[in-house]
From Swiss-Prot:
The protein's name in its UniProt record: Periplasmic nitrate reductase, electron transfer subunit
Binding-site positions, heme c 2: H114, C133, C136, H137
Gene3D superfamilies: Flavocytochrome C3, Chain A
Region annotation Disordered: where it falls in the sequence: 40-65
Keyword Transcription (UniProt): no
Primary location group: periplasm
Annotated GO biological process: anaerobic respiration
Entry comment on modification after translation: Binds 2 heme C groups per subunit.
GO annotation, cellular component aspect: periplasmic space
Species per Swiss-Prot/TrEMBL record: Bradyrhizobium japonicum
Amino acid sequence: MRRAHRAGERVMMKRFGIALLAVAIAAGASSLTAQTVTSGLHGPAPLNDEGPAPPMLPNRNTSEREVRNYPEQPPVIPHTIDGYQVDLNGNKCLSCHARARTAESQAPMVSITHFMDRDGQFWPSISPRRFFCTECHVPQNTATPPVSNDFTDIDTLLSRASPGGRR
């Protein structure tokens, strides 16, 4: 008789423990949804709300070429490209950057890699997979970074690593 009574107590304790755990989980979940967590990038709006969009800042519009930060980085676009057509019907970028137009426009020529297909074969014109410039090349705007950045470019890293700062 005592064994049956103890077994019944154990079952009741297990059920009580499970019920208590369920109540604790529910209370914790409801307190999490009530909190507003803020992030430097998201702003003061609650995470499940969409805050107002930040204002669009003007693009830099200069003829200066920017230094690349790492090898093989696509060059950034130093001028505005508002209204440029870059689609299946045409590519406004090539009116200055095409091989035949660079002498007249004084713009840098499209890289020779843009004339290669995925098999390494050269084409007489831009490879279709490189036709849409803005997939890799982007204009730069005047925004201040929303978070601090201590990025160091490759040349600086290499000069620190070499004796005497030389490469």
